[in-house]
């Protein structure tokens, strides 16, 4: 199946009451594990690529070529989107679009509102011309992700969310409502009241960033309030690192990367399968 944008995927998920996971790519093994999990679970999937991970893997074009080749090799039949995670500028989004990404996130949430609207609208115009979906963010998701550091959480303003959607034509919205990137210190405190209000007023599928460590009950509640995309990266990184440590602790003389990265790949796959089942996306493709 060819790569697709997120639009239909997320609208269907919102309608049917489940969420599609965005799982971030960090290297070959992450890409293999996530695609294998999606095909086995018969789940649609979004492959997230941050600017930093894109650079690490040799550029956006390299990532697209790798994903397409693996999809062919694994005979992938489920819908797959390649999505730029936290695109920092119009230029970065344009680069991803021209490299073959099927979806982009423009994150101008740290700029004043009017500037966020102007930048986002410009990205939407280019993206939609190429059949690419667009995600935008309002408020501030806490924690750190690659080049993006946000200390505290600034909740999104429901009225601004509605205005951003109306003035830009984005396909999905990531309102910051208490989630953070990276491991949580204590229990996450999600703003469900705001989530419900934003979901109703915009009518768009909502996106939950920082999906690692959010209790299942909160995940289910978020989905019931219109969240159709949940981002996961830290959990896969932790499980893969744990597998590498365990392998090397048991065999300190091991030097063949396949012998320690193989178990890491399996650990990622298991984690992703668990998330797909939790989000309700298994058997939806």
From Swiss-Prot:
The keyword Kinase does not apply. One of its GO terms (molecular function) is fructose-bisphosphate aldolase activity. InterPro entries: Aldolase_TIM, Class_II_FBP_aldolase, FBA_II, Fruc_bis_ald_class-2. Its cofactor is Zn(2+). It comes from the Bacteria. Zn(2+) 2 binds at residues 107, 137. Keywords: Glycolysis, Lyase, Metal-binding, Phosphoprotein, Sporulation, Zinc. PANTHER family: D-TAGATOSE-1,6-BISPHOSPHATE ALDOLASE, D-TAGATOSE-1,6-BISPHOSPHATE ALDOLASE SUBUNIT GATY-RELATED. This is Probable fructose-bisphosphate aldolase. It comes from Bacillus subtilis (strain 168).
């Amino acid at each position: 199946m060819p790569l697709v944008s997120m639009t239909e995927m997320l609208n269907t998920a919102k309608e049917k009451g489940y969420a599609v996971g965005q799982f971030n790519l960090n290297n070959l093994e992450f890409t293999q594990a996530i695609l294998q999990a999606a095909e086995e679970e018969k789940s649609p999937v979004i492959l997230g690529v941050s600017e930093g991970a894109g650079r690490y893997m040799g550029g956006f074009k390299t990532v697209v070529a790798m994903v397409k080749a693996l999809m062919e090799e694994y005979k992938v039949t489920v819908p797959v989107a390649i999505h730029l995670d936290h695109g920092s500028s119009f230029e970065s989004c344009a680069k991803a679009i021209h490299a073959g990404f099927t979806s982009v996130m423009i994150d101008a949430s740290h700029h004043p509102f009017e500037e966020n609207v102007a930048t986002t609208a410009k990205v939407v115009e280019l993206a939609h011309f190429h059949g690419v979906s667009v995600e935008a963010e309002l408020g501030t998701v806490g924690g750190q992700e690659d080049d993006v550091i946000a200390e505290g959480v600034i909740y999104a303003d429901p009225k601004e969310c509605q205005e951003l959607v109306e003035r830009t034509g984005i396909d999905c919205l990531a309102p910051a409502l208490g989630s953070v990137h990276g491991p949580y210190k204590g229990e996450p405190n999600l703003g469900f009241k705001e989530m419900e209000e934003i979901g109703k007023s915009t009518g768009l599928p909502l996106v939950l960033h920082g999906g690692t460590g959010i209790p299942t009950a909160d995940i289910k509640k978020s989905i019931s309030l219109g969240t159709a995309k949940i981002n996961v990266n830290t959990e896969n990184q932790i499980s893969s690192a744990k597998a590498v440590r365990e392998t090397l602790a048991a065999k300190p003389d091991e030097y063949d990367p396949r012998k320690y990265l193989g178990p890491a790949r399996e650990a990622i796959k298991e984690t992703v399968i668990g998330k797909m089942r939790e989000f309700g996306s298994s058997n939806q493709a």
